[in-house]
Amino acid sequence: MGSESLVHVFLVSFPGQGHVNPLLRLGKRLASKGLLVTFTTPESIGKQMRKASNIGEEPSPIGDGFIRFEFFEDGWDEDEPRRQDLDQYLPQLEKVGKEVIPRMIKKNEEQNRPVSCLINNPFIPWVSDVAESLGLPSAMLWVQSCACFAAYYHYYHGLVPFPSESAMEIDVQLPCMPLLKHDEVPSFLYPTTPYPFLRRAIMGQYKNLDKPFCVLMDTFQELEHEIIEYMSKICPIKTVGPLFKNPKAPNANVRGDFMKADDCISWLDSKPPASVVYVSFGSVVYLKQDQWDEIAFGLLNSGLNFLWVMKPPHKDSGYQLLTLPEGFLEKAGDKGKVVQWSPQEQVLAHPSVACFVTHCGWNSSMEALSSGMPVVAFPQWGDQVTDAKYLVDVFKVGVRMCRGEAENKLIMRDVVEKCLLEATVGPKAAEVKENALKWKAAAEAAVAEGGSSDRNIQAFVDEVKRRSIAIQSNKSEPKPVVQNAAVADHFGAKATTNGVAADLAGSNADGKVELVA
C-alpha cells in the first residue's frame, strides 16, 4: 500500500530536543501501526536534524506505515538570538504557525494526502486552535510524567496549596501521589523560580486542554498506576510509553537528534560488564564550572570507568563553555571517555554500563527505567526534581546525589564518589539493579503486542481512522448554502466548517472529552 492511501496524521513539535524526540518516537509508533505521519517543526531545527540524522525527502517506511518530514520557516533569521528567549519566541512561533500550518495542510490535501488529525506537544497549544478552525480533531502528547501533569493541573486550577511567597516551604499533597516536599514540586511552580517564562509556557497547554480529544502520555500504566487512574477521570488520558521502544520497528533509522552522536560504542565494547558510569545531563542543563570540577574529581577518585557527555552550549544561550580540570584526561587514561553527544538508547542498553548519572529529565528517566539501568539522581529544575523523587523513593532504582537548584549547594567530590560507589558496588547497588530490571520487564510488556500501551496506541489509531472516515463522509455530503446572517445563526458553527470536530468531540454531560476505543 502506498503512503498516499493511508490515514494521515500531522505532528507539530516545539523546536526543543526534549520535545522533538518523544513526538518523533510517537510518530514512528503511529507509522508502525499503519498510518502516514508527517512531522513538522521550524526549519532552524530541521536543518540540524537533516545534518545529524540523514533525514531524506521521501517518506520512510516504518512497520505498516510511513513517516515524512516538512519544516517551516519561523519568520526569523537563522542566527536570531531571540529564539533563546521563550517570552519572545513563543508568540512569534504562534503567529507564524497559525498562518503556515493551515497552508501546509491544504497543500497536503491538494497532493492527495488529506490530514485527519493534528498532534502537538507542550509549549504550542495553539495547534489545537488550528485544528478546530479546520474542522479537524487534535490530540496532545505530554512529554513529562503523569505525576507532573497532575501537579500542573492542580496548580492551574488552584485545587491544593502550593509553595507561595507567604509559605515557601510547605509540603504538597496531591491525590494518589506521595507527599512532595517543597523542593520536590516541579520547580517552575516555585514563586521564586528564575524560569517564570517556562511556567507560562506550560500553563498555556492547560488553557486549551478541553480541545484535544486525547492526551497521549509517554509513560505506562504499570509505572504510575494510581495517578493515571485518577487523572483519567478528569482528562482523556492514554498512556503510550515508553515511546523509544518500538517492537514493530526496533531499528528504524529515523532520529530526531540535533547533533550527530560520537562513536562510543566500540569503547564500551572494550570494557567489562557493569563497569562503566554513564554521565549525561541532557540537552538543556548546564552546570557551573566549580560543580563540573567536583564531578570530574569524584569520577577519578571512584576508580570506575566512565563515559561523560559534555554537550557544548548554544552560542546564544549565555552559558559558558565548560572545561575539564587540567590533566584530567591524562589521569583518566583509558578508564574515561568524554564525548559531545551520545547515542543514549544504545549506551543505556550496553552491558558494560553499570549506572547512569542523570539530570532526571523525563526522556532520560523513561529510557533508564525501560533499559533496567540504575540511576544516580542529579536533578536541577523543572520536572527533574519530581522525577528524581519518583526514581529514588517510589520506583527505587537509584541514589540521590542532590536535590536541585533550590538546594543552592555545591556537591563536593567526596559525595560524588560515595554516590557512584553506592550505585555500583555492594547491597544497595544490587537492590536498585534488581528493581530496575523489574521496571524494564514491565516496560517491555507494556509496549509488546497486547500490552497496556500497545492497546492504547491501537485504540488511538482506530479512533483517528474512524474520525477520518467521518470527515471524508462529511466533505462528500452537500452543504447548505448560507445566504444571510439569519440562516448562519440557524445552522451555527456546523454550517461554517467542512469538518466534524464539534460532532465528533465525544463530550459527555460533564463536558469531559472521551476517547472512543
Curated annotation (Swiss-Prot):
Coiled coil: none
Pfam family, one: UDPGT
The keyword Cytoplasm is assigned to this record: yes
Catalyzed reaction equations: 3,4,5-trihydroxybenzoate + UDP-alpha-D-glucose = 1-O-galloyl-beta-D-glucose + UDP; 3,4-dihydroxybenzoate + UDP-alpha-D-glucose = 1-O-(3,4-dihydroxy-benzoyl)-beta-D-glucose + UDP; 4-hydroxybenzoate + UDP-alpha-D-glucose = 4-(beta-D-glucosyloxy)benzoate + UDP + H(+); (E)-cinnamate + UDP-alpha-D-glucose = 1-O-(trans-cinnamoyl)-beta-D-glucose + UDP
InterPro entries on file: UDP_glucos_trans (IPR002213), UDP_glycos_trans_CS (IPR035595)
Alphabetized SUPFAM superfamilies for the sequence: UDP-Glycosyltransferase/glycogen phosphorylase
Biological role: Glucosyltransferase that catalyzes the formation of 1-O-beta-D-glucose esters with hydroxybenzoic acids and cinnamic acid including its derivatives as preferred glucosyl acceptors. Has significant activity with gallic acid (3,4,5-trihydroxybenzoic acid), 3,4-dihydroxybenzoic acid, 4-hydroxybenzoic acid, cinnamic acid, sinapic acid, coumaric acid, caffeic acid and ferulic acid in vitro.
Tissue: Highly expressed in leaf. Also expressed in peel, stem, root and aril.
EC number: 2.4.1.136, 2.4.1.120, 2.4.1.170, 2.4.1.177
Gene: UGT84A24
Similarity section: Belongs to the UDP-glycosyltransferase family.
UniProt organism field: Punica granatum (Pomegranate)
Name the UniProt record assigns to this protein: Gallate 1-beta-glucosyltransferase 84A24
EC class of the enzyme, as a word: transferase
pH-linked activity: Optimum pH is 4.5.
